[in-house]
UniProtKB/Swiss-Prot annotation:
This is D-amino acid dehydrogenase. One of its GO terms (molecular function) is D-amino-acid dehydrogenase activity. The keyword Transcription regulation does not apply. Its EC number is 1.4.99.-. It catalyses: a D-alpha-amino acid + A + H2O = a 2-oxocarboxylate + AH2 + NH4(+). Pathway: Amino-acid degradation; D-alanine degradation; NH(3) and pyruvate from D-alanine: step 1/1. Keywords: FAD, Flavoprotein, Oxidoreductase. It holds the Pfam family DAO. FAD binds at residues 3-17. The gene is dadA. Oxidative deamination of D-amino acids. One of its GO terms (biological process) is D-alanine catabolic process. InterPro entries: DadA, FAD-dep_OxRdtase, FAD/NAD-bd_sf.
Length: 425
């Protein structure tokens, strides 16, 4: 059976790999000249099941106003005359209740934990390397009020048997000795001991090579113009390089998925939320992070990737343009110098932005559509790297008509098409 995967980011490449392992004849098309060159290119580098959380939560509407007014805040909203944006914002606000947050977080932790296990199995199977480390994530709190507010998250971690440690200042320094120089800057932390880190782009490149060795055909520099439907199914995909026809089709185009699906009458609540990162060469090894430190005040992740430090964060809602805004870099620089002063050479940093495909409730959208042969694997938000292997395994099992190893019903598009469509039931 022939399958066409649209998108060669970490989601598309991972899906293609597992499809090929399952015996499908796979083609992947992407507009870029190689794999993982958009959202997967320079993300924060975390594989963080324990930190998987929806952005929509109790108190977020109030915090959002504060963040927008703070020039170093983690949220920027650039108003657009775009009904899709405002529908997405309204849906997100409706998910900002304690009960919805708990439900959505449990769904996200479930797929993320499964994905981490799939990644480990893949690593053992083919020996793939990507500057990976398995030394946990430290969520660092500068204020006591932040530390006091983690009770609900901790209960969900217990529910899913996710190992964690609540640490005082000394415990944080034991986990990340580089913090010793700034020990008065924070009060404590939550350490997620099973979380990992790694270079998502390097992983995507190397898995693409493994998939190609299994017979996957990667077609680059090919822009999709339209998806053509006939008789309740996809009949083909029209591109600037010609028409592609397959038996099954997988949508893995991240933030751009809705633009191609909308003409088919398939409306998915995925909207781009731009993130920024800097990648900094290490100049002082002892002063550098060992793994990932999440600066809870700025919502910034500081991650060790080999001989580099990746600092990623901020959320900019408003358009599909990856343009760099220098004032966003100031926040990233500030977080790094606050917590790991002198660790990296900021004068040699590279600055990047990418579009995260966010759903308003948090979990991704994986599953069938009203077109019989069109499948979705999109909307992973900030957690595409964390969820990639598990999401791909779920999608491939569904395409094989095999029951996935986890309950994936709550990840389907149907959660937006019920009586609670505005919530993501």
């Amino acid at each position: 059976m022939k399958v066409l995967v649209m998108g060669a980011g970490v989601i598309g490449v991972t899906t293609a790999y597992y499809l090929a392992k399952a015996g499908f004849e796979v083609t992947v098309i992407d507009r870029q000249p190689g794999p993982g060159l958009e959202t997967s290119f320079a993300n924060a580098g975390e594989v963080s099941p324990g930190y998987s959380s929806p952005w929509a939560g109790p108190g977020v509407p109030r915090k959002a106003i504060q963040w927008i007014l703070d020039r170093h805040g983690p949220l920027v909203v650039r108003p657009q005359i775009d009904p899709a944006m405002w529908r997405w914002v309204v849906q997100m606000l409706r998910n900002c209740t304690a009960s919805r947050y708990a439900l959505n977080k449990s769904r996200m932790v479930g797929i993320a934990e499964y994905s981490r296990d799939c990644l480990r199995a893949l690593r053992a199977d083919i020996g793939i390397t990507y500057d990976e480390r398995s030394q946990g994530t430290l969520q660092l709190f500068r204020k006591q009020s932040q530390l006091d507010a983690i009770g609900g998250d901790v209960e969900i971690l217990r529910q899913y048997n996710v190992p964690f440690e609540v640490l005082d200042r000394a415990g944080c320094i034991r986990a990340e000795p580089g913090l010793a120089a700034v020990q008065n800057s924070f009060v404590g932390g939550l350490r997620l001991v099973d979380d990992e880190t790694g270079d998502c782009h390097l992983f995507t490149q190397r898995l693409e090579a493994a998939a190609a060795a299994l017979g996957v055909n990667f077609v680059y520099e090919t822009t999709i113009r339209s998806i053509d439907a006939q008789g309740g199914a996809v009949a083909g995909v029209t591109t600037d390089k010609g028409r592609f026809v397959a038996d099954r089709y997988v949508m893995a185009l991240g933030s751009f998925s809705p633009l191609l699906l909308r003409p088919l009458g398939i409306d998915i609540p995925v909207y781009p939320v731009k993130g920024y990162s800097i990648t900094v060469p290490i100049v002082d090894e002892p002063a550098s992070p060992r793994s990932t430190v999440m600066d809870e005040s700025y919502k910034v992740a500081i991650t060790r990737l080999g001989d580099r430090i990746r600092v990623g964060g901020t959320a900019e809602i408003g358009d599909y343009q990856p343009r760099l805004r220098p004032n966003r870099r100031v926040t990233l620089d500030r977080s790094l110098t606050d917590l790991f002063p002198g660790a990296g050479d900021l004068s040699q940093a590279t600055f990047w932005s990418g579009l995260r495909p966010m759903t308003p409730d948090g979990p991704p959208i994986i599953g069938p559509t009203r077109l019989a042969n069109l499948h979705l694997n999109t909307g992973h938000g900030t957690l595409g790297w964390t969820m990639a292997c598990g999401a791909a395994r779920v999608a491939v099992d569904q395409l094989r008509s095999v029951e996935p190893e986890i309950d994936a019903r709550a990840l389907s598009l149907s959660r937006y098409q019920s009586g609670a469509a505005s919530l993501g039931a």
